Amino acid sequence: MWLPFGLLLMATRIVIGLTFPRWLSIPILQATGIRYTIKGLPNRINEDTEKRSKGMLYACNHRTLLDPLFLSFSLNKPLTAVTYSLSRVSEMLSPIPTVRLTRDRDLDGRIMESMLGQGDLVVCPEGTTCRERFLLRFSPLFAEMSDRITPVALNSHVGMFYGTTAGGLKCLDPVYFFLNPCPVYSACLLGTVRGMGTCRDVEGLKFEVANHVQRMIGESLGFRCTSLTRRDKYMVLAGNEGIV
């Protein structure tokens, strides 16, 4: 009985998110039943960011394709998202700027460096969505991009419709999420971690930083940290390497 109304509600929420300015869309979306919470010190982080020539780098776990969007809404500030394997549909419909990474380490490093010079950046080092109660291995590239990294623990809660874990279209994540009557997103800012923006030649340190950020997020969410890669995930669940 919910599905017909849910489809109408989902379409309404997506149209609002895509067409209304952020300051107006946030209260309207909340009125439709969407809830989001944020813990941490966003005001202090905003002030620190304004004093630096480089934007803040937010590193978060990857629950759904909506992660960067809800972080932007929670902080009430513009963010640019860098992501792997983003479909053209998701890229075109995203209400925040998105930049596609190539899995070429040197090229991706230059892309992220350029984006940080223009403003705040959010990256999901797992490289793919993971909806279970564990974290995939964090790629260490983000640890080399900035001296100051803000780990963010993200989680989503829905009651009826869930996004796919392995196969299927990831661009349908927003559809499944917004079909739910009262979906919830939570974000927890976990302070600031020292990155390697000025000391990239220290071999091995980037892995320590990446693992430390993973542990911080895992402890905050109560998730288990693993060394599984995105390739491991797709080989086990779908029998392929998950290349889009």
Give names to the regions the model predicted.
Residues I38-I45, K51, L65-P68, L107-M112, ...:
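Eukaryotic intrinsically disordered and solvent-exposed regulatory patches
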Residues I14-P42, N46-D106, G159-M160:
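Catalytic core of membrane glycerolipid acyltransferases/transacylases, capturing the structured
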Residues E208-S220:
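Short amphipathic C-terminal alpha-helix that caps PH/PH-like domains
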Residues V89-M92, G119, R131-F207, R224-N240:
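A cross-family acyltransferase "interaction/gating" segment
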Residues M1-T19:
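A hydrophobic membrane-anchoring feature enriched in long, contiguous, low-charge segments
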Residues M1, L93-E113, G117, S146, ...:
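N-terminal hydrophobic signal-anchor/signal peptide
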Residues L8, K54-C60, L79, V82-Y84, G117-P125, V152-L154:
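Generic beta-sheet signal
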